[in-house]
Amino acid sequence: MEIKMVGMKPGERIEFSTIEKRPNLTLSDGGRIIVWPILALEVWNIDRAMARMVISPPQGEPMTPDHPNWSWHEYGMRVGFWRLKKMLEALSVRPTVTLNGRVCDDYPEVAGACLDAGWEFNAHSYEQLPMHKLDNERTVIDRSLDVIEKFCGKRPRGWFGPGLTQTFETLDHLSQAGIEYIGDWVLDDQPVWAQTTHKPVAALPYNYELHDIVMMNIQNNESHIYRDRAMDYFNTLYEESTDGHPRVIALAMHPYLSGSPHRIRYVRETFEKILSFPGVVCWDGEQILDWFAKQIPA
């Protein structure tokens, strides 16, 4: 049965805090930057409108089933994922894998490869449907966590909403279901605590600027822009981090975009360049959560 809640707006869940006037977070050995690599794995149901499009339908008419865009995403699971996996393993980068629970059912080889690699499993709902369009939000959350836990033997601690969507009640449902952190908010360079009707949930720093969907699918930038923008972004935060406030930089990847042949080079160069700097660590979401919670308890 769906639990009815009043809900809270984000500003009611978090305290306003400027980065210049808050307790310092510290990284060992003078660390300054945490890189948070995120690999999103999704299921696009061909019976519905596609989550994203690389090609618009003829005459602009809605198209269902949408074979062209469905197959574009399918390439990511058949080829792009494996290209990214080889790159990440060669660089000793262990990403947070945020996946629709249905990936475990529809693409068990892909999910199994992540499990064998020891990567963190983060819940991304059951399939790629926006949270604010669900009639049974809590039921879908529970199903997502249950399916992933059954597959990997561990319940996810973190969550990304499909398309970063939420309702005013989502965080309350997530906290009651055992979720400890979310990645849906892009409001800071450091983690923050968000209050819920149950236990506080940490909002880890995410961003749109270094998101492959935003850069490559919405803004239609050339492939090298991924690397160039990431380095500009990193250089600024690296310089600022001398103030005693380590920053978090999230790098979001989708196999059908970042795993394409003409982009993988620039994704690899981004990680190589950033990780070559002293004082930079590469952590998954659980590591960032534990680091933050130990120094600034909820």
Regions found by a protein language model. Name each.
Residues 2-202, 228-251, 257-298:
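Catalytic alpha-helical scaffold of carbohydrate-active enzymes acting on polysaccharides/glycoconjugates
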Residues 205-238:
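A conserved mid-domain beta-alpha-beta active-site/ligand-binding segment of alpha/beta enzyme cores
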